[in-house]
Regions:
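Active-site-proximal alpha-helix that buttresses catalytic centers in soluble enzyme cores
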Residues: 2-84, 110-118, 132
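Active-site-adjacent alpha-helix immediately C-terminal to a catalytic or transition-state-stabilizing loop
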Residues: 83-129
Length: 132
């Protein structure tokens, strides 16, 4: 059973965004990363795409969802500050979960750069995919 835990693509810096941080969008680099993630993640047999409801996470996986014809589902368990509530989501074959750095750390104890991902087999990290 293979799943992918993805940290959202580049979205600039929190302190540079004057509005509600949940609405912070991807920057130019992040938009490029999100487009490149399509080919990077296509080989993993993606059947379901889940995302934190934060704009930067949704935007990270929108190109993947569109390219694969898979519905993008927002899930609050992947939102910043939700802790390890999303652990059960990673126990589904073919799921991509897009989230934030603090959630990645809570779930697998790792630290990913923006746009990078961990590939998991039966809930255990087996590989890191560097950010495009």
């Amino acid at each position: 059973m293979t799943s992918v835990l993805l940290r959202h693509a580049s979205a600039g810096e929190r302190h540079d965004f004057e509005h509600d941080d949940r609405r912070r969008p991807l920057d130019k680099k992040g938009r490029r990363q999100s487009d490149e993630l399509v080919e990077l993640l296509r080989p993993f047999g993606v059947r379901r795409i889940l995302s934190s409801p934060y704009v930067r996470c949704v935007q990270t996986v929108e190109p993947l969802a569109a390219a694969l014809g898979v519905e993008l589902e927002e899930d609050g368990r992947l939102a910043e500050g939700a802790g390890a509530a999303a652990a059960a989501l990673l126990m589904e074959d073919g799921v991509v979960c897009c989230t934030h750095g603090d959630i990645v750390e809570a779930l697998v104890g790792g630290d990913l750069k923006k746009g990078a991902a961990y590939v998991l087999e039966d809930g255990e990290v087996v590989r890191e995919l560097p950010a495009p």
